[in-house]
């Protein structure tokens, strides 16, 4: 079997210095500038009100959303979710869809500025606070990201400043260290579980970190994610199960490295791009592999996490030789397990960021934590 040349890992992640330096220069200037000049700067700066009141956007800027279409199948699908019954906020229910309905409402508001969508989204945000009580960490990990992104899209810090400052933000901060019914916190799950639990937790942790402006927390999240993708020099603290799908059982990773394979059952078994911790859910190493939907489920969290980190300035899509693109191609091309159901949003985002050249579903369904990518990135 032809081996693929493996690109060595990039250095441990650090928040991009140019933007940080630029921010420091702006703060230093603001501290000494005459008041009239400050007023002029606020008036002229694009999105000045939002920037003055809070943190950078979590996932996508207002300017980017303004360029998206308000017609076509993808828009119609998004609008349907925004207009339909969004149910009841219940973060403790790991199968709740209220978060993605809230996200849909926020996206439609951000594009159309129709106030009724923001009103509904904010009502759901208020209802969601505290509903994680009694639930497992997986439920919190799945459901939290959509609410955080929605809060950013509706500009909660300006639309409902008292709620945002006194309730929503303190609550978000508490979710990172809140002990859930399984005895774990979101941080612990992110740093210990190299499966879908951990990737969803990482996405939620990244979203909260950006929304709250927690730079150190975001850097740690990026470090853990880089380790999961395959750079054990960045992080290697995960607890793995059956290692039979690992290309190197002595150095397990979340996604097997490029060009790796193993010999079993009388044949060479390709492993490059496999998610070992989820492939084992279909059974110990064998070929053909027994089908399991867990690899795509783990990629839900990983895909959103990569996009949040990328938007924050990290080169997350390229880490470990484009690990997420390799994983998607392994599932789609090698195993012939294309994304189906609530995983169909992933190929659109992965392909948009990596040119993976994987088949794009003609329509998508939102997943556990995100969706509407055929509209956002199509």
Describe each model-derived feature in a short phrase.
Residues 289-293:
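A short glycine-threonine-serine/GTX helix/turn-capping micro-motif
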Residues 216, 220:
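Aromatic-lined glycan-binding groove of carbohydrate-active enzymes
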Residues 51-193, 199, 203, 222-237, ...:
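Extracellular glycan-targeting catalytic surfaces
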Residues 2-17, 22-52:
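Secretory targeting and sorting signals
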């Amino acid at each position: 079997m032809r081996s693929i040349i493996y690109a060595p890992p990039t250095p441990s992640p650090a928040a991009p210095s140019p933007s940080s330096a630029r921010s420091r220069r702006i703060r230093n200037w603001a501290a000494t500038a005459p008041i009239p000049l400050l007023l002029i700067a606020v008036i002229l700066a694009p999105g000045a009100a939002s920037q003055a009141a809070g943190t950078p956007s979590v996932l996508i800027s207002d300017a980017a959303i303004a360029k998206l279409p308000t017609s076509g199948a993808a828009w119609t699908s998004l609008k349907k979710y925004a207009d339909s019954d969004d149910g009841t906020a219940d973060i403790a229910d790991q199968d709740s869809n209220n978060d993605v309905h809230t996200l849909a409402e926020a996206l439609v508001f951000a594009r159309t500025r129709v106030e009724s969508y923001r009103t509904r989204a904010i009502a759901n945000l208020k209802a969601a606070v505290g509903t994680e009580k009694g639930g497992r960490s997986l439920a919190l990990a799945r459901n939290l990201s959509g609410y955080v992104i929605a809060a950013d899209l509706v500009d909660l810090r300006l639309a409902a400043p008292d709620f945002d400052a006194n309730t929503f933000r303190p609550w978000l901060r508490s979710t990172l260290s809140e002990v859930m019914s399984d005895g774990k916190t979101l941080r612990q799950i992110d740093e210990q579980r190299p499966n879908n639990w951990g990737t969803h937790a990482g996405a939620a942790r990244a979203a909260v970190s950006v929304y709250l402006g927690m730079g150190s927390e975001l850097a740690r999240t990026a470090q853990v994610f880089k380790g999961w993708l395959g750079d054990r020099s960045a992080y290697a603290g995960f607890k793995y199960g059956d290692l039979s799908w690992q290309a190197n059982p002595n150095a397990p990773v979340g996604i097997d490295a490029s060009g790796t394979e193993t010999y079993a059952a009388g044949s060479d078994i390709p492993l490059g791009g496999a998610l070992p911790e989820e492939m084992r859910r279909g059974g110990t190493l064998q070929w053909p592999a027994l089908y399991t939907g867990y690899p795509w489920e783990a990629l839900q969290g990983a895909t959103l996490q990569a996009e949040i980190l990328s938007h924050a300035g990290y080169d997350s899509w390229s880490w470990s030789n484009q690990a997420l693109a390799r994983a998607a191609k392994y599932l789609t091309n090698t195993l012939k397990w294309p994304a189906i159901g609530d995983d169909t949003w992933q190929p659109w985002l992965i392909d948009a960021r990596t040119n993976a050249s994987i088949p794009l579903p003609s329509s998508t369904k939102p997943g556990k934590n995100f969706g509407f990518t055929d509209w956002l990135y199509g």
